Swiss-Prot record:
Organism field: Zea mays (Maize)
Positions carrying N6,N6,N6-trimethyllysine: 79, 187, 306, 396
Biological function: This protein promotes the GTP-dependent binding of aminoacyl-tRNA to the A-site of ribosomes during protein biosynthesis.
Keywords: Cytoplasm, Elongation factor, GTP-binding, Methylation, Nucleotide-binding, Phosphoprotein, Protein biosynthesis
N6,N6-dimethyllysine modifications at: 55
Presence of the UniProt keyword GTP-binding in the record: yes
Family, similarity comment: Belongs to the TRAFAC class translation factor GTPase superfamily. Classic translation factor GTPase family. EF-Tu/EF-1A subfamily.
Molecular function GO terms recorded: GTP binding; GTPase activity; translation elongation factor activity
Protein name: Elongation factor 1-alpha
Lineage: Eukaryota, Viridiplantae, Streptophyta, Embryophyta, Tracheophyta
Subcellular location: Cytoplasm
Length: 447
């Protein structure tokens, strides 16, 4: 078998008709875990429905439809393998909740694949002021997705077909935009492809022999291997807390940083409750330690279910334990708010697993969202497209961290009127020390 390949997460972004589904479907179809029988069934259905354009989007449409109907799709269907990596495609962004998911992210993407429609009119629509290309790229960068591959898609439909001139024009324009966002275009591969015909997806295309760079598959193999933050202090935001007969209280969540293991003394923020971890389980198997990315349940002693809630964060009691945030200052980008936002605005913040109302206590500065330079001190308000530094105060106890130290606990979505109206990253946190926090006997013994 040899060493198992590294797992990486990829987020596919781009304008609505750029061909994201077709391209992703194609990769999954050719390299992925979709059972041949399933494919044959899809192909037959596609033929019956006269969908000549079946190719690959159909695969993804079927998967999505089944997923949305609540049929649990084997997640392997969203995976494919390159020579070097196991790749998982995280939430394709056609989804309403894409932005929220990308932030509270079940997983941080290691690389964004930006799909561009190269056809006449298609490219212009995607990159225009209202197009999603810009917003997605800005979001990816703000949320710390530092690597990117850019696919100039639909090269089979440019005028003339497979036009080098069109490719060059697009690379020039997209590079200048990505540079403004903060990416370094010299480090980005621009791969001319056809997700539909398959040019340069996996094999080199003779139609594009003027292009000397990597195919999409090769570009994926050139992604820098991500470093997983297991050497940082533990942060494990709770998703749920169960009471299990004969075992006791079992909090469940995903290790974001650090490790958790049996025998450890953990402190839960924001309350400061401290106790010993008896056992750690993943998929019903006991673990000696759980690492970042692992979804685990762990059993704690002498703790009632009511003492823990979703959004609490487990941490090592001696290693920078998680504490309540009295206030925090964040860089916020306003995305789709119809009016203007001033001091006193009180939306809901989705940060890691917590969902808590906060107050915009003070608009500190308005900044240029690309360069980060200050434009104005203490602005009266922020509106769509603006970025600013904002001091926020939670209305209930909550744990947040700075983005630089604990990224998954330092990025958030601002929700109001049932949509994401802003995104932000936390620059500094003023923490409160817990008063009268309970320390269980098991933990006291360990001290």
């Amino acid at each position: 078998m040899g060493k198992e390949k590294t797992h990486i997460n990829i987020v596919v972004i781009g304008h609505v008709d750029s061909g994201k589904s077709t391209t992703t479907g194609h990769l999954i179809y050719k390299l992925g875990g979709i059972d041949k029988r399933v494919i044959e069934r899809f192909e037959k259905e596609a033929a019956e429905m006269n969908k000549r354009s079946f190719k690959y989007a159909w695969v993804l449409d079927k998967l999505k439809a089944e997923r949305e109907r609540g049929i649990t799709i084997d997640i392997a269907l969203w995976k494919f393998e390159t020579t070097k990596y196991y790749c998982t495609v995280i939430d394709a962004p056609g989804h309403r909740d894409f932005i929220k998911n990308m932030i509270t992210g079940t997983s941080q993407a290691d690389c964004a694949v930006l799909i561009i429609d190269s056809t006449t009119g298609g490219f212009e629509a995607g990159i225009s002021k209202d197009g999603q290309t810009r917003e997605h790229a800005l979001l990816a960068f703000t949320l710390g997705v530092k690597q990117m591959i850019c696919c100039c898609n639909k090269m089979d439909a440019t005028t003339p077909k497979y036009s080098k001139a069109r490719y060059d024009e697009i690379v020039k324009e997209v590079s200048s935009y990505l540079k403004k966002v903060g990416y370094n275009p010299d480090k980005i591969h621009f791969v001319p492809i056809s997700g539909f015909e398959g040019d340069n997806m996996i094999e080199r295309s003779t139609n594009l022999d003027w292009y000397k760079g990597p195919t999409l598959l090769e570009a994926l193999d050139l992604i820098n291997e991500p470093k997983r933050p297991s050497d940082k202090p533990l942060r494990l935001p709770l998703q749920d807390v169960y009471k299990i007969g004969g075992i006791g209280t079992v909090p469940v969540g995903r290790v974001e940083t650090g490790v958790i293991k049996p025998g450890m003394v953990v402190t839960f923020g924001p309350t400061g409750l401290t106790t010993e971890v008896k056992s750690v389980e993943m998929h019903h198997e006991a673990l000696q330690e759980a690492l970042p990315g692992d979804n685990v349940g762990f059993n704690v002693k002498n703790v009632a279910v009511k003492d823990l809630k979703r959004g609490y964060v487990a941490s090592g009691s001696k290693d920078d334990p998680a504490k309540e945030a009295a206030s925090f200052t964040s860089q916020v980008i306003i995305m789709n708010h119809p009016g203007q936002i001033g001091n006193g605005y009180a939306p809901v913040l989705d940060c890691h697993t917590s969902h808590i109302a906060v107050k915009f206590a003070e608009l500190v500065t308005k900044i240029d969202r690309r360069s980060g330079k200050e434009l104005e001190k203490e602005p009266k308000f922020l509106k769509n497209g603006d970025a600013g530094m904002v001091k926020m105060v939670p209305t209930k106890p909550m744990v947040v961290e700075t983005f630089s130290q604990y990224p998954p606990l330092g990025r958030f979505a601002v929700r109001d009127m049932r949509q994401t109206v802003a995104v932000g990253v936390i620059k500094s946190v003023e923490k409160k020390d817990p008063t009268g926090a309970k320390v269980t006997k098991a933990a006291a013994k360990k001290k």
